[in-house]
Amino acid sequence: MSRPIEFKTILLACLIISVGQLSMGLVFPSLPWIAKDFDISLDQAQLLVSVYLLGFGPSQFIYGPVSDALGRKKVLLAGLLIAMLGLLMIIFLSHTFTGMVAGRFLQGLGTGCCAVLARASTRDRFNGPELPVALSYIAMAASITPLVAPVIGGFINAHFGWTMVFISLLGYVLLAWTVIVFRFQETITQTSAMPSPKKMLLQYRDLLTSRYFMSFASIGWLNFSLMITTVSVMPFIMQNQIGMTSDQYAMWALIPAFGMICGTSICNRVRPIIGTKKMLLVTPILHVSSAAWLFFCPVEPLYLMLGQLLMILGNAIALPCAQAMVMQPYKKQAGAAAAMSGGGQMVVSSIVSMALVQLGLSQAWHLSLVIVVFATITLTNVLRGFATEQPSEQ
């Protein structure tokens, strides 16, 4: 009989990964008010998002290998201290936009540790069939947080002003830091010397040239990209083409969020019975069904959300299964593997979503064609990944 899974470890990982997601999503609704207060354009206010991502994305590639050498807890605490320093800069320099931009970059630089080390510490703790279950909860937290964060941020901004958004973030990061100090137990048993830049680059080169790693990592990258693209396009369809207000859309958007919870629950219950490969093969089926629905359905809220629900169900199954397959062979280099997986996810999703928007993706049937292409690539990578021999323990 298998031992019960350690939910305390999973909850800690979910708390850690939510810090980075909240730090981005909570600020979105405040941008128009920040632009108005500083008498700048909305495009200029978007710089607060861009510089955050500039710090958040690349820093992951450093945190991963460093935590493999020095341990997860020290690196987490140091990263969150940097994030709090950035937030203090934003709060106390809120009278100058330049000061806020500098603070946001520092905040992103600090919170870059969260996604990497949440996954790496989970890989340290769990093995075998427990790993996909644990990672499914983390994937759910990472996916739902960006959906609910703008709703929370909009409420805080509407009732207390945009400065309170950053004060709330500071409080949340401080809470996470305190919990880690007292509750997080180091998951690395042996520390080593700090890796040189050359060694880091060699580790990433080995991962990028691994057919196994790239097959499963790209499944996660493309599924996350599909979610980000849909989140960007669907508000335009619902608000501009249907005439829905942002408050109304926020309520409808809870349906896809519910789909993420359902998909994760289905994955956790069915995967141990049919296996990871068959579970992953369900994703292209759900995505093609979603594409067909969105292509033919009327442009009405309920129909559009049901189509997105089918897509999200596929994402909720693919993300934890692919992440588990990515991390499985890399116990001693879990930080580097998590960094490449998570950092690559950020890079690919940014490029893909921007490229599709630039190509004029603005209709539901446009989205359906994109989903079909992504489903085909996912199917190819699933078959290729399982046909490739798993790398030996690193």
Question: What are these model-predicted stretches?
Answer:
Residues 58-96:
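Conserved MFS/SLC helix-loop-helix module at the cytosolic interface between two early adjacent transmembrane helices
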Residues 60-71, 263-276:
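Helix-to-loop junctions at the C-terminal end of transmembrane segments
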Residues 1-3, 185-216:
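Juxtamembrane intracellular "pre-TM" segments in multi-pass secondary transporters
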Residues 327-361, 370-371:
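A late C-terminal transmembrane helix in Major Facilitator Superfamily
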Residues 103-144:
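Cytoplasmic helix-loop-helix junction between adjacent transmembrane helices
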Residues 171-190, 381-382:
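C-terminal membrane-cytosol helix-exit motif in multi-pass small-molecule transporters
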Residues 86, 98-106, 302-310:
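Paired small-residue
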